[in-house]
Amino acid sequence: MKTVGSSSIQRIQLQHRLGLVQSFNIEKGMRVLEIGCGQGDTTVALADAVGETGFVMAIDIAGRDYGKPITLGEATDFIKSSPIGNRISFDLEADFLTMKIDEAYDVAILSHCLWYFQEPATLLSYLKRLKKVAKRICIAEWDLEWTKPEQLAHFYSASI
């Protein structure tokens, strides 16, 4: 599998995700629904937290070929082949508003994905449906205020 950037950056990103999961009070044995899983950065932390008796349903509206330099397909295949892969089900090209959900979840997670919603009304529709299938909803999003000059380029690219 391809890697991007230095391993120290990857460790920092993983520590961030592990901290989020801890703040969400994810426990062993929980059933978690993750909206906007992307390449699975938060998914991996969730799967670790729920343990062998838990389950993570990770969905994303993007397809397997989305993402560079690592696509969602490459990333999710790699995760599924890992020791925690049996705790996760990925559903890509899935629109949560139209997909069939027959099971209840302990918690729904939206981690760093809100800015992909083009309309606030769509996000509101997601949240209303999530209330019906999950006991709790946890949200984490990047702060869009830059505080250091070196953050400005990323801020502008994210704002497009």
Predicted regions and their residues:
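Conserved alpha-helix/loop element of class I SAM-dependent methyltransferases that forms part
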Residues: 11-30
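Conserved class I S-adenosyl-L-methionine
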Residues: 30-38, 138-159
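Class I SAM-dependent methyltransferase SAM/SAH-binding core
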Residues: 48-96
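Short conserved loop adjoining the S-adenosyl-L-methionine
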Residues: 97-102
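A short SAM/SAH-binding and catalytic strip from SAM-dependent methyltransferases
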Residues: 107-121
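A short glycine-rich, Lys/Arg-flanked "PGG" loop and its adjoining helix->strand segment in the class I
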Residues: 122-136
